[in-house]
């Protein structure tokens, strides 16, 4: 698919080189510190990018597996964070090569809003599979108010899903979208927030989800 190749090329151009001392965490995960502290299973950081969240989990003493579709991102993770259990390069559309019920936490920070609806549900099913019963998924996704980062721009392929000028897919969520896509989890927290990691203000939905225990 052209979108997959375009996405890979784009992110490899972004994740060129990082130095650990310049990698910063922001405070969005602090809300979940009690959950993080009590987590005994490994943590999966999907779409790890430069390693902002990987760093946060490492500093909390967690066993982290970091993943990204960009080989440059993974090379930087391996260079900057030798503490990680593993750093794996794969596209989420290919599925997740992990055992069932393996992770206590999955972190998807700005990495789940690049897919068509059917693919998004497939990825979320994979995340539920690899989470332990009662495990947690921490998410941030684009808001429909995220105009500084392309909200409403490009060709609309599905409601709130756009094909951008560089040939990538980009989805923007309202609260109804957020609750619909994540309805197979228990939604513990869902709030529209502003984040300031980048040069311009970004608007996101921050969501805390819990995998349901069967039976």
Please describe what each predicted stretch is.
Residues 97-99, 116, 174:
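GHKL-family ATP-binding catalytic core of two-component histidine kinases
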Residues 1-40, 49-85, 89-95, 138-215:
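Class I (Rossmann-like) S-adenosyl-L-methionine-dependent methyltransferase catalytic domain
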Residues 104-119:
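A short SAM/SAH-binding and catalytic strip from SAM-dependent methyltransferases
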Residues 121-133:
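A short glycine-rich, Lys/Arg-flanked "PGG" loop and its adjoining helix->strand segment in the class I
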Residues 96-106:
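A short acidic, Gly/Pro-enriched loop at the edge of an enzyme's catalytic core
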Residues 46:
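Conserved beta-strand/loop positions that form the S-adenosyl-L-methionine
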Residues 112, 134-136:
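Intrinsic-disorder/low-complexity, polar/charged segments enriched in Ser/Thr/Lys/Arg/Asp/Glu/Gln
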């Amino acid at each position: 698919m052209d979108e997959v190749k375009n996405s890979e090329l784009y992110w490899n151009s972004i994740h060129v080189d990082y130095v650990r001392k310049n990698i910063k965490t922001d405070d969005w995960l602090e809300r979940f510190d009690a959950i993080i502290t009590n987590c005994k299973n490994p943590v999966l950081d999907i779409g790890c990018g430069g390693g902002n969240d990987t760093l946060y989990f490492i500093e909390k003493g967690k066993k982290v597996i970091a993943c990204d579709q960009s080989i440059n991102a993974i090379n930087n993770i391996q260079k900057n964070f030798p503490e990680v259990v593993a750093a794996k390069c794969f596209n989420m559309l290919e599925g997740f090569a992990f055992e069932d019920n393996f992770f206590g936490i999955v972190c998807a920070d700005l990495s789940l809003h690049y897919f068509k609806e059917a693919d998004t549900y497939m990825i979320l099913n994979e995340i539920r599979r690899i989470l332990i019963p009662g495990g947690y998924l921490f998410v941030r996704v684009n808001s429909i108010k995220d105009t500084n980062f392309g909200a409403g721009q490009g060709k609309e392929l599905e409601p709130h899903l756009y094909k951008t000028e560089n040939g990538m897919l980009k989805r923007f969520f309202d609260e109804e979208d957020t609750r619909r896509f994540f309805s197979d989890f228990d939604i513990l927290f869902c709030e529209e927030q502003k984040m300031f990691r980048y040069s311009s203000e970004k608007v996101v939905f921050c969501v805390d989800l819990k995998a349901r225990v069967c039976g």
